[in-house]
A protein has these predicted regions:
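A short alpha-helical cap/connector motif
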Residues: 4-5, 9-180, 184-258
């Protein structure tokens, strides 16, 4: 008998084995890539592990923060205290109230007074405590700011020697001092403010760095706080003041402990 040639005629189908073999290889490669991506082997119908409570909370807080900042016309620009606009997150305004009631300062220094909404709010809190006054500085002298016997406005840069000296002269011996920084939020400026004003705050009181949420466009208040705390053991970030979850001042509620 002659040998049978292993050929396929022009009108015959080619065997499927090579095709199936190639498909199987591609499938296995895809599975391997998927396993490497997920970091573990799993069945296609295996449920994903449930998210932790902290992960769920973080996602919800981030979602709220995004909504809050994307809708400033109905949030930041539409927040009032007794008819006057206050550019503050209400949750943070409440924390200020708790701090001032728990440990009332004699002097609250504010950098970045703008139209005086926050100063007016602080003055109302001091009225209820029957003590305290506000020293606040802004680059521009706005004429339509609220007038209150507890508020003294200064015009100039918060980091100028003249303004700092004016504040120091206004503080009487033995007075308790609290400071909140809410002017230029770029890192270099905030860090300079921290270096200048940290010595004015009395032990047990707060140095608040406002708007410390990280800015993707430039180093800001958060980076200033991080650098400041590395070199100053007199302060700690009081995380208990972030109890509501959302704050515009993360790591910014600095308490002087020594």
């Amino acid at each position: 008998m002659g040998q049978v040639e292993d050929t396929v005629g022009p009108n015959q189908r080619k065997p499927l084995v090579p095709v199936i073999g190639m498909g199987l290889l591609l499938f296995l490669a895809g599975v391997a890539i998927g396993q490497a991506w997920n970091g573990r082997w799993f069945r296609a119908d295996e449920p994903r592990p449930p998210k932790s409570e902290s992960e769920i909370s973080a996602e919800r807080i981030e979602g709220f923060m995004t909504w809050y900042y994307e809708n400033q016309q109905t949030t930041f620009s539409n927040t009032y205290w007794r008819g006057m606009r206050v550019i503050k997150v209400p949750l943070d305004a409440w924390i200020f109230q708790e701090i001032i009631h728990e440990n009332p300062p004699d002097v609250l220094i504010e950098t970045g007074s703008y139209k005086g909404g926050s100063a007016n709010y602080f003055a109302s809190l001091f009225d209820m405590e029957k003590r305290g006054r506000i020293l606040t500085v802004e680059l521009e002298n706005f004429t339509d700011r609220p007038r209150h016997p507890r508020i003294t406005y200064f015009t100039g840069s918060s980091v100028s020697p003249e303004i700092l000296q004016s504040f120091k002269k206004s503080i009487r011996p033995g007075e308790k001092v609290m400071v909140t920084l809410d002017s230029d939020h770029h890192k270099d400026h905030v860090l300079k403010e921290l270096q200048l004003y940290s010595s004015l705050v009395t032990v047990g009181d707060y140095l608040v760095v406002e708007d410390s949420i990280k800015n993707p466009n430039y180093p800001g208040a958060m980076e200033a706080v991080e650098e400041f705390l590395k070199n100053n053991s007199n302060y700690v970030a009081d995380k208990s003041r972030e109890k509501f979850g959302f704050t515009a001042n993360p790591n910014g509620w600095l308490k002087r402990i020594r």
